[in-house]
Amino acid sequence: MTDMRRLGQRAKQASLLIAPLSTQIKNRFLSTLAKALVDDTQTLLAANQKDLANAKEHGISDIMMDRLRLTSERIKAMAQGVQQVADLADPIGQVIKGYTNLDGLKILQKRVPLGVIAMIFESRPNVSVDAFSLAFKTNNAIILRGGKDALHSNKALVKLIRQSLEKSGITPDAVQLVEDPSHAVAEELMQATDYVDVLIPRGGAKLIQTVKEKAKVPVIETGVGNVHIYVDAQADLDMATKIVINAKTKRPSVCNAAEGLVIHEAVAARFIPMLEKAINQVQPVEWRADDKALPLFEQAVPAKAEDFETEFLDYIMSVKVVSSLEEAIFWINQHTSHHSEAIITRDIKVAETFQDLVDAAAVYVNASTRFTDGFVFGLGAEIGISTQKMHARGPMGLEALTSTKFYINGDGHIRE
């Protein structure tokens, strides 16, 4: 069983050792790591094959296997993400504001590291590298606890990172992997208030809920993606068809894939047959439709209440027909996970109302929800997509992994 106390102590000590690292040293190391990832591709693929074989033996679906799978191209993309983080401006030490107060005190507010970040995540091994690169660039140590399905991949990736750190003369304890997959150890990490400054969970609804219930350390919640697309009465239906197909079928296992379709009744009778025919030529989808939408499909099943709350991560989509923009907004706000939402419309005023009133971290007009991603938003590799409103919201890049500190300089000042 993992000794969480010892692991936490090492992480805390490492956070103090890497706190003074300069931007130049950090960037040089990240460039070295990016190259090492590509150079070690075959070793990483061999480790990933063990995870894939185990997953296949346990009957994991093809879509979930896709979340777990590493390929040469995906490793190359990981390396590019690391290099992009190296190329980004360093937020640490950035002066947010500076002024002299009425007493003559010189006051600066600067960005500083959080300290030790803990990350609990599922399936995707690339999270290990993405999370480490962002944490390291912001002078934070990180503790990683991945799912048991990706254990071999995560061990290989973290081993590579630690070896690269050691070769560069930097403490390898800047990254630690919790290899014990037990829930008991995960709960220990959630409650490690002496060592962990913030915990970021990244996974399905069950994981997020467990963290919310069990954690004693501060948490930045990265929610599930119950993502909707609303096709308005003034929508370009050809555009809507293209966007829905992309958002649902391109990669259904990711959190920015669309799960719910909301359609204005004025266009439902034209749009549903048009969409169904077009999507069947790409990838058939199981439609779970409400009473108004159901008769408009050639093939669909009646939706149950829970279908409108579900992140399917599969070729399944709920469908709701509404009579107004107001009803669409109300419906989405009732069922959203506050991740990403989209409207297809040619009416600028309708679009602005939707963007203002829908409660989500990212709200799109005439674009696929698949763009909600730190890399796409220019943040470099993301550590997660926050669906809460405090501290950080949306794709979390470098600034989300910093806090602030006030630096006050005086000359013998005392307060009378």
UniProtKB/Swiss-Prot annotation:
Gene Ontology cellular component list: cytoplasm
InterPro entries noted in UniProt: Ald_DH/histidinol_DH (IPR016161), Ald_DH_C (IPR016163), Ald_DH_N (IPR016162), Aldehyde_DH_dom (IPR015590), G-glutamylP_reductase_CS (IPR020593), Glu-5-SA_DH (IPR012134), GPR_dom (IPR000965)
Superkingdom, taxonomy of origin: Bacteria
Catalyzed reaction equations: L-glutamate 5-semialdehyde + phosphate + NADP(+) = L-glutamyl 5-phosphate + NADPH + H(+)
Transmembrane segment boundaries: none
Pathway participation: Amino-acid biosynthesis; L-proline biosynthesis; L-glutamate 5-semialdehyde from L-glutamate: step 2/2
SUPFAM superfamilies assigned: ALDH-like (SSF53720)
GO BP term (any one): L-proline biosynthetic process
GO MF terms, alphabetically ordered: glutamate-5-semialdehyde dehydrogenase activity; NADP binding
Predominant localisation class: cytoplasm
EC id: 1.2.1.41
PROSITE patterns xrefs: PROA (PS01223)
Class of enzymatic activity (EC top level): oxidoreductase
Keywords (A to Z) from UniProt: Amino-acid biosynthesis, Cytoplasm, NADP, Oxidoreductase, Proline biosynthesis
Subcellular location: Cytoplasm
CDD domains xref list: ALDH_F18-19_ProA-GPR
UniProt record similarity statement: Belongs to the gamma-glutamyl phosphate reductase family.
Annotated function: Catalyzes the NADPH-dependent reduction of L-glutamate 5-phosphate into L-glutamate 5-semialdehyde and phosphate. The product spontaneously undergoes cyclization to form 1-pyrroline-5-carboxylate.
Name used for this protein in its record: Gamma-glutamyl phosphate reductase
The species this protein was found in: Streptococcus pyogenes serotype M49 (strain NZ131)
Gene: proA
